[in-house]
């Protein structure tokens, strides 16, 4: 990710990866990082330079393992292929944006991770708060919330009328089960056997404690069927939706 205005303050080039790792070690006041993520892919980044840098950081002890985040399945496959061919450190975990509102990773990313033995730790299981059902369709979001602040990323992704309506249906089902919509959503992610764990993103201590309570809820087949009915496997909650930060690149018009 970009961490400044300089030309070498972003991307997956060797200089920036090395510098960013050293900066992280200094800020964390530690000798090594357990898992160092390539947080997003830059498809024009030299694959060999990127992967060999991760291997160098591993061999010199600055990181124990590295992972991939927001990588397309074909890029995951390319990284694994290069690592195997050149006997360098392999990625051990993938961090996709995956929740009951966005099931697109089920098409290629999750099967690829399973095939290559890569752990999966999805982020944003609550769809930036939408799956807590605290946002009512047609009602202004509460002050102090992410939507209430008109967060740009949320407004261009999760905060859609279709998603808000689905969250209310999940809430009604969850309450009949004696739990909350948020707890249901977290457990839905964990109920996928391909997933290793899940990344929680609480903003307050109360939110963190509420995350932990989610583990007390036992997911069942009826919950799985509900989400399948509301959001078909492999699809987002809104037909035709795609995150503008991660556009599809499979069409290059000859004339436009």
Task: Put a short name on every predicted segment.
Residues 1, 72, 98-102, 124-131, ...:
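Glycine-rich beta-alpha junction loops
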Residues 143-176, 191-195, 205, 209-256:
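Terminal-tail/helix-coil boundary detector
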